[in-house]
From Swiss-Prot:
Stated family: Belongs to the metallo-dependent hydrolases superfamily. Adenine deaminase family.
HAMAP family the UniProt entry points to: Adenine_deamin
Organism: Lactiplantibacillus plantarum (strain ATCC BAA-793 / NCIMB 8826 / WCFS1)
PANTHER family: ADENINE DEAMINASE (PTHR11113:SF2), N-ACETYLGLUCOSAMINE-6-PHOSPHATE DEACETYLASE (PTHR11113)
Alphabetical UniProt keywords: Hydrolase, Manganese
Name of the protein in its database record: Adenine deaminase
One record GO biological process: adenine catabolic process
Highest taxon listed in the record's lineage: Bacteria
Cofactor(s) required for function per UniProt: Mn(2+)
One MF term in the entry's GO annotations: adenine deaminase activity
The protein's enzyme class: hydrolase
Catalytic activity field: adenine + H2O + H(+) = hypoxanthine + NH4(+)
Amino acid sequence: MTKTVEMVITGAQVLNVYTREFEATSLWIDHGRIISNLRDEPYIAAQHVDATGQWIVPGMIDAHVHMESSMVAPSELGKVLLQHGVTTIATDPHELANVAGIAGIQYLIDDARQTPLDVCFMLPSSVPCVPFDDNGATLHAADLRPLYQQSEVRGLAEVMDYGAVARGDTDTLAKISDAYAYGYHADGHAAGLNAHQLNVMRNAGLDTDHECMTVAEAQDRVRAGMAVFLREGTVERDVLPTIGAVTEANASRFAFCTDDKMISDLLTEGSIDYNVRLAMQSGMRPELAYTLASLNGAMAHRLSDRGSLSAGQLADLVVLDDLEHVRIARTMKRGQWILPSTTKPLPFTATRVQHHAQLADFQLPLATGLANVIGVQPNHIETDHLTLPIDATQNFEADCQRDILKMVVIERHHNTGKVGVGLVHGFALKQGAIAGTVAHDAHNIVAVGTSDAAILRAVAQITQDNGGIAVVDNEQVLATMPLAIGGLLSAASYQKVAEQLAELKRAYEVISERPLSFDPFITLSFLTLPVIPTLKLTARGLFDYATFDFIPVAIQDNQRQTV
């Protein structure tokens, strides 16, 4: 008896990721899976789709992403990613986990169930990212274990605390071993590590890295046996500087990720489809670029049921009108064409922004003529450690002519009263201030401005909103975006969030000296992350990654660099 199947797609050029070639063949689909990729089969298809003149590639996979960086809830993010051909993501929910602990992770899992997008949760390994950061929760191995009972959980996310790994911290190693005990794996985070340090990470069981910024770094990690995720986010623009590390011989060790990408950039550029476009623009063959975007991400995360268009695989696929420009006609997820969705984010009420910061807390006396200053690196999350001449003063506020501004970090989770104050170069403000509750990874309040009063006004606005981002011109609020979900995510639609981000950027142009080549809001959010080089500010003060210790703002040393 002839078997009836749900669908056959004919006429297209179909990518075989195993041979890295396009084939003129058919795809037979039934019950959410591909049952054959042969042109002729003795099946009767209930639906026939003619894709003549088009290309079909596997659904794309984002191998490492923090959903919270989009600033929309998972159910909203899924709507956008599926439009861009992304059918699976491996996400590290450590942003909301740092704010709300297990409740934050569970919220993301629950809300993600509203989208057809497959969201594979890698449990956060470093909450807090370092013991001396003031976040909202602490998660030990024992806290994470019950989450492995949920099918969405697929391993351990990036282990960022190299020091804990190197000294054999019991809880850190338990988190890693738990991931393997449940049949999964553990992601690494090897920013700035040398070959010897990479071996320490590998011996602990960490088998991926997404922090490469150069060809040499990527090659070192491949030689060490790690899978490398080439990253293109809002700030982390690393695909073009690293794509030269990929060869036909080692290509299976590379996949693509976005890490941190705002919804506005996802809408204008794309997600992994943008990484593919960049790779091909740099000279990579389309067959290879689309393989990095699909099969390789699946292999890195041990997702054996996806990543190719072969029998037995999930029917996750992308139909393209234009191969080299990645022009997507439509996306299929588990055998169903993606259609517009009307779902709305689930409510979240687990946290409140709480602090009692006042103007006096922003005082920064400088008794000497030199200061340690954070230097912004445009479109990178690393910073420069600048040593700049500063006039002695009882309270430094801003030197707009030299683009040296005051920056503050206010603990917002437990109302401890901790406030870190430092200096930053690179934001080009001429007046006003900006503030936000997105501040990796502890997500305290972070602000930068030209006066203490402007900083306090911006802080007051986001406190009133129970989290968000604000731009003020002295006392006037020019734009604000409430982030009701833990101070990280908006409860609004992705379209509304994109509009609000555009308003924030327009407001920033009003108070800035010149147009910036980078996003000031997400850039500011990374100036508080102590596990990324070089100089960062936390609620406890200025932190030097090179010495892995806190340092004063005012110094006596010889001048290192001037502006």
